[in-house]
């Protein structure tokens, strides 16, 4: 809730900013990242661990200009896979751990459920609601609908869970299909090109400035979010986070520490 997601977000941001100390102090960088990884595990969330690892690989490539060997990636992913599997076995005491991991593919089954139904296409209504309604606090709009965006699909396909106020299960591409129907590939191409242009822009700025705020935006544009929620395209929120990281760097008086957030190109 109000503490869970911000805590994960700050752990991710702290880990990414810690990467920028890697060249000066590997011990400090690794200590900060490991500490935040432990915090993330204590939240019961595994996805951000992969995000931190991939972000670090991208940091080495885009900031430190190092070549990443293929076998290093294979070994690293194997270690992380073993750790995550062990975490599943430890936290899920009921049933088979493999079956519990397989249940994470529910979004695929839900997408097929939507695609194989006679659901009337919404032509962008669900997307608009997810992007707009989700950002309006209920304190400001007391009559805000309960069934907007993916929640409307939950109401249609999983009414029992919806009326028990259990939220919306992940529908994957099913949510887009419910919106655009046969035009879904067209939307994916258009949105993909737009996001690709943004990713290229922030990639260039990251390599040019070697700074954390541009790096955070680059990560978001290629699919690595520091805000662990699934609803909506959180571009404005990531801009705000990147801006706060930039502002924080301007209040650091020591040039020895300042490179952590905003490197000097001298």
Task: Map each language-model feature to its residues.
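Central hydrophobic cores of alpha-helical transmembrane segments
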Residues: 28-38, 74-81, 189-193, 213-221
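Short aromatic-rich membrane-water interface segments that cap or initiate transmembrane helices
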Residues: 1-5, 116, 176-178
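Membrane-embedded catalytic interface detector for glycan/lipid assembly enzymes
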Residues: 1-67, 80-94
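Structural motif marking the loop-to-transmembrane transition
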Residues: 4-6, 23-31, 46, 50, ...
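Aromatic-rich transmembrane-lumenal/periplasmic boundary elements in polytopic membrane proteins
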Residues: 70-148
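Long extracytoplasmic/lumenal interhelical loops at the membrane interface
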Residues: 127, 132-183
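Hydrophobic alpha-helical segments
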Residues: 12-13, 19-21, 168-266
